[in-house]
């Protein structure tokens, strides 16, 4: 009941702010990399579709440029989550944490990890010194049937306790099965229906970083991490109208229109979310890199 009331009053708060011409973002995830220590067959962020040839990893400069552009157009980001792939693989993470701490429009932030990497002391100190860093969110994959690398949960818990850093441990060990990703060719009404049935509340930001020797483009905001991953796998041109380009100028109307939108082309690539979901053990591994299929 407490969460329902909180959700209700937050909705009323954001509606009131919009009526006053204010733009507040409740929650956004920044994707640092599609590289991961695991290759989970039903990863809902589509990391199992990335190979060494098409991986995305932002630069510190690129992700901050995109984040700064967003912050120039909003009053606040209530909560920001750092994700991957596995975000602890991002070499400039301590510097990013310090940079986020200096951006006062970001009210709180945290990070999600799969528990296979123990953070270095430099990063732990950055977490500890931050006044707005809330926690490390650790997934529990101890019941996964075929992990290829060892989990570092106990060592991770010990280090976080040593530094006095809050963390949560997401126990349960059950996911739902994610079907293969491909364009279903639904009607516009069918795509909207699938979006409304899904309602994944995870707006996703990716920088415009490309290859090592290629010029950086503008970053973008997507409706979810599936959409942001698809923009890299299929090419962003495929999804025109689905995203906000983080470019110079006033983006406030575009941001408000984005949040009011109910048609996203990326939703046509997902399974039918109106049907019952099939429970499976968390983090089942696949040896093969999956492919986004082309079907008639």
Give the positions of each predicted feature.
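Conserved alpha-helical substructure of the radical SAM core
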Residues: 2-113, 118-125, 129-130, 296
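Accessory C-terminal segments flanking Radical SAM cores
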Residues: 183-296
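Charged/polar, solvent-exposed surface patches and flexible loops
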Residues: 65, 69, 155-158, 162, ...
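Generic alpha-helical propensity signal that fires on short helical segments
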Residues: 48, 98-100, 127-129, 154, ...
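Conserved AdoMet/S-adenosylmethionine-binding subsite of the radical SAM
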Residues: 90-227, 232
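Short, surface-exposed linear patches
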Residues: 53, 64-65, 103-105, 132-135, ...
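A structural signal for well-ordered alpha-helical scaffolds and beta->alpha junctions
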Residues: 25, 60-63, 93, 149-153, ...
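Short, charged low-complexity linear segments at domain edges
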Residues: 6-24, 169-180, 229-253
């Amino acid at each position: 009941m407490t969460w329902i009331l909180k959700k209700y009053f937050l909705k009323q708060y954001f509606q009131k702010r919009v009526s006053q011409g204010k733009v507040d973002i409740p929650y956004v995830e920044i994707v640092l990399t599609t590289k991961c220590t695991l290759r989970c067959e039903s990863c809902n962020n589509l990391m199992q579709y990335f190979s060494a040839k098409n991986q995305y990893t932002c630069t510190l400069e690129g992700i901050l440029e995109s984040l700064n552009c967003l912050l120039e157009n909003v009053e606040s980001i209530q909560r920001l989550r750092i994700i991957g792939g596995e975000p602890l693989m991002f070499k400039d993470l301590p510097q990013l944490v310090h940079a986020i701490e200096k951006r006062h429009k970001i009210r709180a932030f945290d990070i999600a990890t799969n528990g296979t990497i123990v953070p270095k002391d430099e990063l732990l100190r950055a977490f500890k010194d931050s006044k707005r860093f809330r926690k490390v969110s650790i997934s529990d994959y101890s019941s996964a049937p075929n992990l290829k690398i060892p989990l570092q949960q106990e060592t991770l818990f010990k280090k976080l306790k040593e530094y006095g850093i809050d963390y949560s441990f997401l126990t349960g060990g059950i996911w739902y099965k994610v079907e293969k990703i491909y364009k279903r060719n639904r009607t516009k009404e069918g795509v909207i229906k699938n979006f409304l049935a899904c309602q994944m509340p995870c707006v996703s930001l990716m920088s415009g970083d490309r290859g090592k020797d290629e010029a950086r483009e503008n970053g973008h905001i997507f409706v979810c991490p599936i959409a942001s991953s698809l923009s890299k796998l299929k090419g962003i041109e495929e999804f025109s109208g689905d995203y906000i380009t983080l470019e110079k100028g006033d983006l406030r109307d575009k941001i408000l229109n984005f949040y009011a939108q109910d048609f996203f082309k990326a939703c046509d690539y997902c399974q039918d979310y109106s049907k019952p979901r099939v429970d499976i053990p968390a983090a089942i591994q696949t040896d093969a890199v999956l492919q986004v299929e082309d079907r008639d």
